[in-house]
């Protein structure tokens, strides 16, 4: 499915079979999720998309061919491909395990071809081995919100009492993983967002409330899934405005990346640690559009 014009429906096209270059793998796509970022690409809300482009970055598939120098993968192995598709490896961010802030990144489904296709080529450094179990459709969202949440959770340490500020896609996955790890999770939502608070409790939150409230006990760690914008030290002084490279990574250090692979068994290896069932609508290739406007 090809985006040929910004804001227009994707077009079903027959394209040449992509060939993996050095350090790349070709993957036969089993499933690819639809993320809000795909809508941003289609609607032109992310700048300078190199049209035509194949969107899609929540990809689950089988390794089909290996480029020169690739090790650690074999044909037929199931892998996941996320949004962050390539980094330079040499800038200061890459050298300090913050490759999601790379000075010269490439993004799957935006600046390199994505997963709304039968085959996709990926940088092998940013392809994650998956287990044999698990529905590809259920696993696909873990390649975006799941990775953002996982990296944030790793950085938060091993504290027993964990706070989640903002309860959206990434946080609801982190909730399930953290509960599976035996942690007590405290969820904070926008003031008055009773639905989000009820959802958090249904996933095992020991407490849920407004972001302006104090939790009933001190927290060992907290993850803040906040939108890009200003930070305040106190009511009369502002930090400079923050302009994140891609605001979909609400928590700093999101987007996954090779320095924080999802290595915990059951997280991206085919198991579902949580008890909330995924309810992802399924569309055959070419049958649906990510939507515009």
Language-model features and meaning:
Residues 87-165, 191:
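NAD(P)H dinucleotide-binding glycine-rich loop of Rossmann-like/cofactor-binding domains
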Residues 5, 16-17, 51-56, 108-112, ...:
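Short Gly/Pro-enriched turn/cap motifs at secondary-structure boundaries
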């Amino acid at each position: 499915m090809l985006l040929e014009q910004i804001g227009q429906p994707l077009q079903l096209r027959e394209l040449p079979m992509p060939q993996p270059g050095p350090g790349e793998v070709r993957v036969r796509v089993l499933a690819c999720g639809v993320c809000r970022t795909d809508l941003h690409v289609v609607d032109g809300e992310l700048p300078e998309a190199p049209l035509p482009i194949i969107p899609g970055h929540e990809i689950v598939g089988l390794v089909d061919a290996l480029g020169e120098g690739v090790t650690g993968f074999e044909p037929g192995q199931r892998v996941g491909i996320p949004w962050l598709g390539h980094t330079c490896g040499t800038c200061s961010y890459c050298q300090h395990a913050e490759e999601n802030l790379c000075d010269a990144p490439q993004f799957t489904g935006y600046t390199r071809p994505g997963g709304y296709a039968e085959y996709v080529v990926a940088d092998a450094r940013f392809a994650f081995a998956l287990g044999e179990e698990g529905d590809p459709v259920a696993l696909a969202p873990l390649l975006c919100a799941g990775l953002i949440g996982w990296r944030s959770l790793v950085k938060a340490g091993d504290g027993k009492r964990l706070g989640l500020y903002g309860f959206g896609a990434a946080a609801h996955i982190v909730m399930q993983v953290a509960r599976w790890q035996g942690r007590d999770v405290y969820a904070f939502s926008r003031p008055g967002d009773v639905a989000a608070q009820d959802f958090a409790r249904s996933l095992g939150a020991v407490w849920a409330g407004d972001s302006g409230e104090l939790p009933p006990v001190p927290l060992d760690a907290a993850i803040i899934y906040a939108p890009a914008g200003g930070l305040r030290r106190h009511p009369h002084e502002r930090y400079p405005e923050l302009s994140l490279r891609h605001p979909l990574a609400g928590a700093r250090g999101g987007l996954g990346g090779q320095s924080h692979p999802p290595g915990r068994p059951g997280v991206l290896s085919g198991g579902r640690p949580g008890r909330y069932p995924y309810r992802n609508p399924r569309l055959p290739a070419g049958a649906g559009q990510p939507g515009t406007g």
